[in-house]
């Protein structure tokens, strides 16, 4: 199990990313706009740097919903490889069965 503080930190990052999504997209559009003046683009870069670091979606880490484990995460299930295996062995995931050939 991951520490509760790590799970809480991840929840905080998701909330900040949602909160600043529009502002961040607006500033990035100005920065990538070739028709904008250099001064406007530079000001947009400076404003983007003033936003909270955790508001960037790239700071988020996929974690297992049950354990909070950051490694071995399977996106399709939202679980770590260990919990997917346990659920599959109990038959809780429809259509998923152990390979045998």
Curated annotation (Swiss-Prot):
The gene is rpsN. Part of the 30S ribosomal subunit. Contacts proteins S3 and S10. One of its GO terms (cellular component) is small ribosomal subunit. The lineage of its organism: Bacteria, Pseudomonadati, Pseudomonadota, Gammaproteobacteria, Enterobacterales. InterPro entries: Ribosomal_uS14 (IPR001209), Ribosomal_uS14_bac/plastid (IPR023036), Ribosomal_uS14_CS (IPR018271). Coiled coil: none annotated. One of its GO terms (biological process) is translation. This is Small ribosomal subunit protein uS14. Belongs to the universal ribosomal protein uS14 family. Binds 16S rRNA, required for the assembly of 30S particles and may also be responsible for determining the conformation of the 16S rRNA at the A site. Keywords: Ribonucleoprotein, Ribosomal protein, RNA-binding, rRNA-binding. GO terms for molecular function: rRNA binding; structural constituent of ribosome. It comes from Klebsiella pneumoniae (strain 342). It holds the Pfam family Ribosomal_S14. PROSITE patterns: RIBOSOMAL_S14. Transmembrane segments: none annotated.
């Amino acid at each position: 199990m991951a520490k509760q503080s790590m799970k809480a930190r991840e929840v905080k990052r998701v909330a900040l990313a949602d909160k600043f999504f529009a502002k961040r997209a607006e500033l990035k559009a100005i920065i990538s706009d070739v028709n904008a003046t250099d001064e406007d683009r530079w000001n947009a870069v400076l404003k983007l740097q003033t936003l909270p670091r955790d508001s960037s979606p790239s700071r988020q880490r996929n974690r297992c919903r049950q354990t909070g484990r950051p490694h071995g995460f399977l996106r399709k299930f939202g679980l770590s490889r260990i919990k997917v295996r346990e659920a599959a062995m109990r038959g809780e995931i429809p259509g998923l069965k152990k390979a045998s050939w």
